[in-house]
Amino acid sequence: MGAGKTTFYEAYLKEAFPTLVPAVREQQQPFLNDRRSFAVEDIRVDTQLLDEAKAAGYSTKVLFISTEDANLNVGRVLVRMSRGGQAAPASSVIDSYRESTKNLSEVRRHADDLIVYDNTAHDRGYRVVAHFTGGELGKAAQTIPDWAAKVFGKELHSAKQRGKPGRT
């Protein structure tokens, strides 16, 4: 909550994926069964869904968005609420922030592509931090935010040492 997932979807994905399926497995299954493309917005990536989708012939791409601090997300949610948007208690926003990165390192082994974005500087837009393809790091930003370093730290640091960072 407050990282910018819905804003990203509205700006960049809605045209290609007009159906945003809730993160409820029962509502996702018909899309898998009918082999229809869809997008899911959730705070935690369902690796089982990724595996099922790949087994059904889908190409899977995870776009993960976070910020440096849960309190930044709380502030954004408060602004959204003041404008009539969806309400959420600060404790829920903080819990969601913590929960969101718990399985992120594992996700890269389940998704065909994992693109990690930092949206801390709201006025500068989304910044690609890392791009994993087939579980392997393809590119990493020159500057890694602390939250991403905690998740992928050694791997991103090693990539820089090998001269693998790209223009992201």
Q: Which residues fall in each region the model found?
A:
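Amphipathic alpha-helical transducer elements in NTP-driven molecular machines
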Residues: V21-R25, T47, A70-N71, A87-A90, ...
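Short, well-ordered alpha-helix to beta-strand connector turns
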Residues: L13, R35, A111-D112
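Glycine-rich phosphate-binding P-loop
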Residues: M1-Y12
